[in-house]
Design a protein with these regions (language model features):
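Short, highly charged low-complexity linear segments
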Residues: 111-115, 196-209, 254-260
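Long, positively charged, glycine-interspersed low-complexity recognition regions
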Residues: 234-260
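FMN-binding flavodoxin-like domain, especially the glycine-rich phosphate-binding loop
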Residues: 1-3, 7-14, 20-32, 41-50, ...
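Iron-sulfur cluster-binding cysteine motifs and their immediate structural context
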Residues: 187, 193, 197-215, 219, ...
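Reductase modules of NAD(P)H-dependent flavoproteins
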Residues: 156, 160, 179-190, 199-200
Length: 260
């Protein structure tokens, strides 16, 4: 099964590639433009993978579904969601958006990965715990693949109880927070070297280099933490005031390889 995905830190990309590869498909980023659209058009079944933000779908993914709704009509979609501590109905939110476009939902899969928020102390865990979470998720993906080959799709996040957990556990309370955060990205001009890594990587083009420094334009930030986790100078924060850890899958992957 081909999987289209959005990934800020690399966690979702890894999971999408693992699932797609094990089901004789390919993983394609929604940021690839025409390739992603052709991937949807050319298949009767497709996977959609994204990280959950406060038990909700990232803004960039919501917009992608809305703008390309006609392509999803009549398609069978398997929703894959990565999460830190809690998701609730992370897959269910995306599934409901897809249903409005005429898609049929095959199932949902929730996958726990290391949290991408590197500027909040309480969300940080030791490397060993992060690596263990990745291993457990890879095993869950393998089980899901075996199950789907027999026509049995997991239903993570799709029940009414999942809906209640997501709505009252996070989403309802954090609507004002999420809206405010879209304008709250902070760039330390003294630390910023103007290298352009953040600007070139921003999926919503909310950052630009002006007069040798990174400048943020508020409003459309999708809260993916890509800029925070890739800035060489650790000059960017969103929720917290200091970058404690840069949370990227390639860092975890390198650590796992070195430990072998």
């Amino acid at each position: 099964m081909n999987v289209i995905y959005f990934s800020g830190s690399g966690n979702t990309r890894h999971c999408a590639e693992l699932f797609a590869g094990a089901t004789s498909g390919k993983a394609v980023s929604i940021e690839s433009g025409q390739e992603a659209l052709q991937t949807i058009t050319g298949a009767a079944e497709v996977g959609l993978a994204y990280p959950t933000h406060y038990s909700d779908v990232p803004l960039i993914v919501k917009n992608f579904i809305a703008q390309n709704g006609a392509l999803f009509k009549g398609k069978k979609v398997f929703v894959i969601v990565t999460m830190g501590l809690f998701s609730g109905d992370g897959a269910g939110v995306g599934a409901r958006l897809l249903k409005k476009q005429g898609a049929k939902i095959l199932g949902g899969l929730h996958l726990r990965m290391p949290d991408s928020i590197g500027d909040v102390p309480m969300l940080k865990k030791p490397m060993a715990q992060n690596l263990a979470a990745i291993k457990q998720t890879e095993q869950k993906i393998a089980r899901a693949v075996d199950s789907t080959k027999n026509g049995l799709y997991p239903k993570d996040g799709l029940s009414f109880w999942h809906f209640l957990a997501g709505l009252f556990g996070q989403r309802l309370w954090f609507i004002p927070t999420v809206k405010a955060l879209r304008s709250k990205l902070k760039i330390d001009a003294q630390k910023c070297s103007g290298c352009g890594v953040c600007a070139s990587g921003c999926p919503t083009k909310s950052i630009a280099i002006q007069k040798g420094k990174a400048v943020f334009t508020p409003g459309s930030c999708t809260l993916c933490y890509r800029c925070v986790n890739h800035c060489p100078a650790r000059a960017i924060t969103l929720i917290g005031k200091r970058v404690l850890e840069q949370c990227r899958y390639d860092i975890y992957e390198k650590t796992m390889k070195e430990a072998r």
